From Swiss-Prot:
Residue ranges of the region described as Disordered: 124-147, 187-224, 250-376
Disulfides per UniProt: none
Species the sequence originates in: Drosophila melanogaster
Name of the coding gene: Mlf
Biased composition (Low complexity): 274-318
Protein name (Swiss-Prot/TrEMBL): Myeloid leukemia factor
Presence of keyword Cytoplasm: yes
Pfam families reported in the protein's UniProt record: Mlf1IP (PF10248)
Taxonomy of the source species: Eukaryota, Metazoa, Ecdysozoa, Arthropoda, Hexapoda
Length: 376
C-alpha cells in the first residue's frame, strides 16, 4: 500500500471515530433535554396541548424562519449575536386577536475542542399564540463545552408575564430555578396562572368551533343516483322459457333535490307486445335496487340475481321480435309503382318466338316478306 493510501485510511478511521463520538454526544444531550422538558412540564403544564400546531385550528405563520448562521461562540442565554431574530419572533403579535399560531426556530453549531472531541451548541425557541393576547414562550439552550442546560417557559397575557427558568449543570447535577414577573406581583402568580390556563383553553375551543363552522357552510353532497330494475316473465307462443322484459325505473328529481320514483313505462312496441309484457298470475316480478350510479344496471342486476340463489334460471334480454303478419312491414304492396322496374313485363316490349331456318334461301325469303310487311 502506498503512503497516500495509508494516510487516507488513517483519516477515514479518525473520521469514523469522530462521527461515532459526535452521535453518542448528541444522543446523550437529547436525552438530557427531554428529561428537563418533562421536569418543566411537571411544574408548569402546557395549556396549549389541546391546540397543538398540527390541529385544524392552527395556521403556520409566515414569520417562521430558520436562519442559517455561521459558527460563533456563545455569549450567554439568549443574548448571543447568533440568534438576532429570536426576540423579534417572540415579541411579535403573531396570532393577532382572532387566531392561533405557532412559531419555532432552532440553531445548532459544532466545533472541535482542544482534545479533538466535538463541541455542540444548540438553542431553540418556540412561541404559541392564542386569541386575546395569550402567548406561551419556550427557550432551551444546551452547551456540551460548559455542560450546562437551560430552559425557560413564559406565560404572557398582554403586558403581564410569568417566566420560570431552570438551569442544570450536567457535570455536578446541580439544578437552579429562577422566576421572573413582568407587571405582576409575586403573590398574584397563582391567580395569573389560572387565568392564563382558562383563556388558553377557551381560545382552543373557539378555534375548533371556527374550523367546524367552515365545514358547516360547505354545500351538502347530493344524494346518490338510484335506479330500479324490474325483470318480469312474459308469456309467448314459443317453447323458450327465457323470454322476459327488463324495465328500468329512473327516479325523478324535483327542484328541492328530493327523489320521486316514477312508474314504469310500457315498451314502445306494437299492441301485441304491450299485452304480452303483463306478468302472469302465477309468477310475481322480482325487483332489484341498484345504487352504484353507473350505467351497467343490467350486469348489477344479474349479479344480485345470482347472489340470491337463482342461478338455475338466468334472466336474459328478449330477442329481437319477429314481425307479425298484421304489421304493415310484413306485407308486400300490390299497388303499381310510378317507377316501373326495367325488367318488369311491358306490353310494348313483348317477346317473340324465334324462327329457325334450315337454308339461306328460306331466310332471305322470310326477311323480304317482313320487309314488305313494314312498307305496307
Amino acid at each position: 500500500m502506498s503512503l497516500f493510501g495509508a494516510l487516507m485510511g488513517d483519516f477515514d478511521d479518525d473520521l469514523g471515530l469522530m462521527n461515532n463520538h459526535m452521535n453518542h454526544t448528541m444522543n446523550a444531550m437529547n436525552m438530557q433535554m427531554r428529561s428537563m422538558n418533562r421536569l418543566m412540564n411537571s411544574f408548569m403544564p402546557d395549556p396549549f396541548m389541546q391546540v397543538s400546531p398540527f390541529d385544524q385550528g392552527f395556521q403556520q405563520n409566515a414569520l417562521m424562519e430558520r436562519p442559517q448562521m455561521p459558527a460563533m461562540p456563545a455569549m450567554g442565554l439568549f443574548g448571543m449575536p447568533m440568534m438576532p431574530n429570536f426576540n423579534r419572533l417572540l415579541n411579535a403579535d403573531i396570532g393577532g386577536n382572532s387566531g392561533a399560531s405557532f412559531c419555532q426556530s432552532t440553531v445548532m453549531t459544532m466545533s472541535s475542542g482542544p482534545d479533538g472531541r466535538p463541541q455542540i451548541y444548540q438553542a431553540s425557541t418556540s412561541t404559541k399564540t392564542g386569541p386575546g393576547g395569550v402567548r406561551e414562550t419556550r427557550r432551551t439552550v444546551q452547551d456540551s463545552r460548559t455542560g450546562v442546560k437551560k430552559m425557560a417557559i413564559g406565560h404572557h397575557i398582554g403586558e403581564r408575564a410569568h417566566i420560570i427558568e431552570k438551569e442544570q449543570d450536567m457535570r455536578s447535577g446541580q439544578l437552579e430555578e429562577r422566576q421572573e414577573f413582568i407587571n405582576l406581583e409575586e403573590g398574584e402568580a397563582e391567580q395569573f396562572d389560572r387565568e392564563f390556563t382558562s383563556r388558553a383553553s377557551r381560545g382552543a375551543v373557539q378555534s375548533r368551533h371556527h374550523a367546524g363552522g367552515m365545514q358547516a357552510i360547505m354545500p351538502a353532497r347530493p344524494a346518490a343516483h338510484t335506479s330500479t330494475l324490474t325483470i318480469e316473465p312474459v308469456e309467448d307462443d314459443d317453447d323458450d322459457d327465457d323470454d322476459c322484459v327488463i324495465q328500468e325505473q329512473q327516479p325523478v328529481r324535483s327542484s328541492a333535490g328530493r327523489h320521486y320514483s316514477s312508474a314504469p313505462t310500457a315498451p314502445q312496441n306494437s299492441g301485441n307486445i304491450a299485452t304480452a309484457a303483463a306478468p302472469t298470475p302465477t309468477s310475481s316480478p322480482t325487483t332489484y335496487d341498484t345504487s352504484n350510479g353507473n350505467n351497467n344496471n343490467y350486469v348489477s342486476s344479474r349479479r344480485s340475481y345470482l347472489r340470491n340463489g337463482h342461478g338455475h334460471s338466468l334472466a336474459t334480454p328478449r330477442r329481437p321480435l319477429r314481425t307479425p303478419p298484421s304489421s304493415p312491414l310484413a306485407t308486400v304492396s300490390t299497388s303499381p309503382s310510378i317507377h316501373p322496374h326495367p325488367y318488369a313485363a311491358n306490353p310494348r316490349r313483348q317477346q317473340r318466338a324465334v324462327k329457325h331456318f334450315h337454308t339461306e334461301d328460306e331466310a332471305a325469303s322470310s326477311y323480304k316478306a317482313v320487309k314488305r310487311g313494314k312498307k305496307k
